[in-house]
C-alpha cells in the first residue's frame, strides 16, 4: 500500500507513511479510509512521513489534498501536523502543502528527520495539554 496509517488513540496521533509511486487517488482514498475508521475521532496530531514517496506531487494536487483534510473535520479535529520529507524537492513541496493545510491544524511544520518531527509534536502536545482548550483556527 502506498499510503498506510496507524492511529495511536492513547498518544492521540495518526502516523501516516507514503511510500513508492503514490498518486492523488491513493491519497484521497486514505482520507476516505480515515472517514470510515472508528478510531479516527476526537483531537489527533498527525505525523506524515513522505521520505519513501517516489512521486513528487504537483502543486495543483496539494489543494485537493488540503480540501480532503477539511472534509473530515466534522469527525476529527486535527491539532498539530509534522511532516517528514528528506529530499529537497519533496521538502519544498511539503512546505507548499504547509501553506494550503495551515487552516486545518493548529500548526504544521516540515522536517527532514523523524526524531525532530516527533520531538516537535511532543513539545506542541505538552504545551497544548497545559493550555486552555480553544482551537485558534475556530476564531
Which stretches of residues belong to each language-model region?
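Amphipathic, Lys/Arg-enriched alpha-helical "gate/interface" segment within cytosolic domains
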Residues: 1-139
Amino acid at each position: 500500500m502506498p499510503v498506510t496509517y496507524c492511529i495511536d488513540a492513547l498518544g492521540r496521533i495518526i502516523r501516516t507513511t507514503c511510500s513508492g509511486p503514490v498518486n492523488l487517488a491513493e491519497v484521497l482514498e486514505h482520507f476516505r479510509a480515515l472517514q470510515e475508521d472508528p478510531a479516527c475521532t476526537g483531537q489527533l496530531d498527525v505525523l506524515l512521513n513522505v521520505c519513501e514517496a517516489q512521486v513528487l506531487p504537483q502543486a495543483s494536487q496539494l489543494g485537493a489534498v488540503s480540501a480532503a483534510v477539511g472534509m473530515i473535520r466534522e469527525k476529527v479535529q486535527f491539532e498539530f501536523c509534522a511532516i517528514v520529507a528528506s529530499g529537497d524537492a519533496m521538502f519544498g513541496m511539503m512546505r507548499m502543502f504547509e501553506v494550503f493545510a495551515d487552516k486545518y491544524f493548529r500548526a504544521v511544520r516540515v522536517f527532514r528527520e523523524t526524531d525532530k518531527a516527533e520531538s516537535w509534536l511532543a513539545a506542541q502536545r505538552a504545551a497544548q495539554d497545559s493550555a486552555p482548550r480553544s482551537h485558534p483556527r475556530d476564531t
